[in-house]
Amino acid sequence: MPSSTSPDQGDDLENCILRFSDLDLKDMSLINPSSSLKAELDGSTKKKYSFAKKKAFALFVKTKEVPTKRSFECKEKLWKCCRQLFTDQTSIHRHVATQHADEIYHQTASILKQLAVTLSTSKSLSSADEKNPLKECLPHSHDVSAWLPDISCFNPDELISGQGSEEGEVLLYYCYHDLEDPQWICAWQTALCQHLHLTGKIRIAAEGINGTVGGSKLATRLYVEVMLSFPLFKDDLCKDDFKTSKGGAHCFPELRVGVFEEIVPMGISPKKISYKKPGIHLSPGEFHKEVEKFLSQANQEQSDTILLDCRNFYESKIGRFQGCLAPDIRKFSYFPSYVDKNLELFREKRVLMYCTGGIRCERGSAYLKAKGVCKEVFQLKGGIHKYLEEFPDGFYKGKLFVFDERYALSYNSDVVSECSYCGARWDQYKLCSTPQCRQLVLTCPACQGQGFTACCVTCQDKGSRKVSGPMQDSFKEECECTARRPRIPRELLQHVRQPVSPEPGPDADEDGPVLM
């Protein structure tokens, strides 16, 4: 599998070392060169042989790395292979070179194949019409095999989350890039995820791709490598654009890949509001300073700055920035109407926007900017996810809601929400116990023990009446408490800051989210 950056001509050891700076790749004498493989290559690809061999070796060694309790503090590395534990680079390198030459050979051949495709693609792109690059860089058929990594040298169990030696992982990413053939990308992504045993959800549109996938760490690493080497995305994506968290394939019930009009459902055509005119990106460090400055003001209500949470109410309910304005909306597709209804609130204001991973702010900030009422519009690059990686004990309090079966990620010990029934501090969502309901509910163990497991009194009553028949689990209906909920709230011109401690306990009929 190729590097995210195609190597220059000649010996590309430097690129390989930059990509795997923790490995000593200079001494390759232990690997027997495959003269037959090299002899079969054309001139341009043959020049990449040295790079491919070193890259194959580095990738193989990297997959054998195991975490240690002290690795975070002192960069200690251990490797496990063939039921042996290796404590230094020299010993693991010697073992791989002498015992796994065949695997290195096959992986080298695979990398060379991918490099040949990349070289051909680059030549096609340079001569193609700039408005239609996809027609030149991808096959006209839906044969996606050229962009699937070779996994023959890996233990099959290593690709399956929970069965390998490492804990699984969940990736969250997006990439805005005009796509000529979203259907081809959809077919490729489906094949790629199935190939790597990944589950999750991926939305593809003419404006780009938005995905969250889970699997083993080996599988997610290979997925990132392929994405970074893919011609259409490699200039717009970098490794830091992939947010990672503990998890795996079990975090999603299945793999869903589809083509839509938008990669994040705001409900407005990208032709009307484009991602190309967003608010100014602030790094987590820059955003932290802006929030610190905002919170240090004696009277935030009189400030010219608004800290705006672009997420849904059930997300901000269990975690949010101090002093934020958190709209009481159920879907992101309600956000444009929320802005329209509360436009005066944003007039002559500096707006600091944030969301989970940054994607909603891209077009949400573009929509707010297009209204022409704000002084400035900023957005948190990488979203809360990246902010918490740098500032786990910063100004964001509580948990980070995620759209998978984990429901939330914890970076600090703060609990900012409460049980819907008794008002005790609680922030762990569960599905409403009524089979036909779509809601999430906050109910503490004590209340659960008393049978309070539904999102509202109406659902609690429905749950006590058993429903029989084949449609019991598949039929869904909107909860009555959702139907009664105001769709678009109107804020006071001097909005009330969200506190960092739990709010007063809600009425028993307060609803939870519709899962999307």
UniProtKB/Swiss-Prot annotation:
Task: Extract the ranges annotated as region (Disordered).
Answer: 490-516
The organism's place on the tree of life at top rank:
Eukaryota
Q: Which residues form the Rhodanese domain?
A: 301-396
InterPro entries (UniProt xref): Rhodanese-like_dom, Rhodanese-like_dom_sf, Rhodanese_C, TrhO, TRHO_N
One Pfam family of this protein, by short name?
Rhodanese_C
Entry keyword annotation includes Phosphoprotein: yes
Q: What protein is this chain from?
A: Thiosulfate sulfurtransferase/rhodanese-like domain-containing protein 2
